[in-house]
Amino acid sequence: MDKILSGKTVAIDIKGQIKNYTEELKASGKSLKISSILVGDDGGSVYYQNFQEKLANNLGIDFEKIKLDESISEENLKLKIEELNKDDSVNGIMLLLPLPKHIDERAVTNLIDADKDLDCLSEVSVGRFYKGEKCFMPCTPNSVITLLKAYNIEIEGKEVVIIGRSNIVGKPLFQMFLNENATVTVCHSRTKNLKEVCKRADILVVAIGRANFIDSSYVREGAVVIDVGTSEVNGKITGDVNFDDVYEKASLITPVPGGVGSLTTTLLLKNVCKELD
């Protein structure tokens, strides 16, 4: 039995949906446009922005790549965001983080129009999300839920354990599992008896950024294991879960790479295709 939950496979289907949608739009004389802002020249962010651009172009979405000098003032960055907010041709805005230390990240992200905030960064967007109002879904948590549903894995009534309580993954994922009527426990660095808690999980999600931290001793026989973490070890990308050790015990498991991360950018672009929600 193949135990692999492949984000790549699921992404192929979603990309097809996006491509069909944008072709229909263009046939009617319309188009979609995303503006992506990069401040500075962080290597990881440069790579990610280039990847976003390539994927968007392949799927028929116009992509504006905005590169700003690391020394830009906070005020000028705010002016740029306000300009994009007012531009009716821009359907979505992405601001690559982190920002330079002299810029107040919270103040800047809160300026992004919630109706264009593809990454769900602003406090208005986050508020809408937690209140269950219409908003763009946080992409990494949404990737986890999308992957589970694509493989017809039952969530309702299941015991879910999330290791990690970050604002980007753990907390919004907690809410999304609640919305699916799961019973959810969130673990963190102060959790006592972590192994015992993890062994209760029907679905175990790990998002702590510690390479190979979770081995089979944390996993209940037959559990579904979702690895959100990515770390570089000896030049290779690896996850938070010791894949080889856990594979035999899990009923299904995501690889790293090729799992959750393979879906995130695709779902980010799908966010701008509102009729596909």
From Swiss-Prot:
Key words of the record: Amino-acid biosynthesis, Histidine biosynthesis, Hydrolase, Methionine biosynthesis, Multifunctional enzyme, NADP, One-carbon metabolism, Oxidoreductase, Purine biosynthesis
Subunit structure, as described in the record: Homodimer.
Any one Gene Ontology molecular-function term assigned to this protein's record: methenyltetrahydrofolate cyclohydrolase activity
Coiled coil: none
Single Gene Ontology BP annotation: methionine biosynthetic process
CDD domains: NAD_bind_m-THF_DH_Cyclohyd
Species for this entry: Clostridium perfringens (strain ATCC 13124 / DSM 756 / JCM 1290 / NCIMB 6125 / NCTC 8237 / Type A)
Binding-site residues, NADP(+): G164, R165, S166, S189, T230
PANTHER family: C-1-TETRAHYDROFOLATE SYNTHASE, CYTOPLASMIC, C-1-TETRAHYDROFOLATE SYNTHASE, CYTOPLASMIC-RELATED
Record keyword Phosphoprotein present: no
Presence of keyword Hydrolase: yes
Protein name: Bifunctional protein FolD
Family according to the record: Belongs to the tetrahydrofolate dehydrogenase/cyclohydrolase family.
A family per Pfam: THF_DHG_CYH_C
Superkingdom per UniProt: Bacteria
Cellular component annotations (GO), alphabetically ordered: cytosol
Role this protein plays: Catalyzes the oxidation of 5,10-methylenetetrahydrofolate to 5,10-methenyltetrahydrofolate and then the hydrolysis of 5,10-methenyltetrahydrofolate to 10-formyltetrahydrofolate.
Pathway where it operates: One-carbon metabolism; tetrahydrofolate interconversion
EC number: 1.5.1.5, 3.5.4.9
Record field: catalytic activity: (6R)-5,10-methylene-5,6,7,8-tetrahydrofolate + NADP(+) = (6R)-5,10-methenyltetrahydrofolate + NADPH; (6R)-5,10-methenyltetrahydrofolate + H2O = (6R)-10-formyltetrahydrofolate + H(+)
